């Protein structure tokens, strides 16, 4: 169970469930096909059934580092990938080592993928969008984030509130447009995809057990999020 600061909400979050086939596996031609394939549920949050101005119910909100915890609310956005609504962190506290995080209420899982559509809009200290996985609490999780001020994508682990960088890719991260950030992970291996192209390949064993997925920002970043997807890996 994820831990952190909860915000009360009276309306259940707009959780759209989509069932997809289990992760396909390449097999040798002579290997028999199993008679049954277990389906794996992918949980997608579109945020479209909630009235703007409310936090999505069921999410757990926390903050790594200092400064204010943050304020996550649903907002309307005409250009949303799945209109009309998105999720945004709207507290513009400029504390540099401040990382607001919103952990989704999906069941914890160990292997699979977490992805989100994100639009970095503004921020003077930072302009970041991130996804977390194997999230234990606000001080312990894996993170990949893109930064439109630095033009890079990075991979970290956060342990006991300390953020440690493991990998970096330098390339264009454009403000004001929608992007896709996805992390596929299995055992100690993680692959980070930015706008559909793999940019980071990393191994680490800091967190090996199950945890939740979610989204993340830094400092005064004003970033929009949509179509947050948690997809456990099938057997």
Stretches with model-predicted labels:
Residues 89-154:
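Secretory/extracellular carbohydrate-interaction modules
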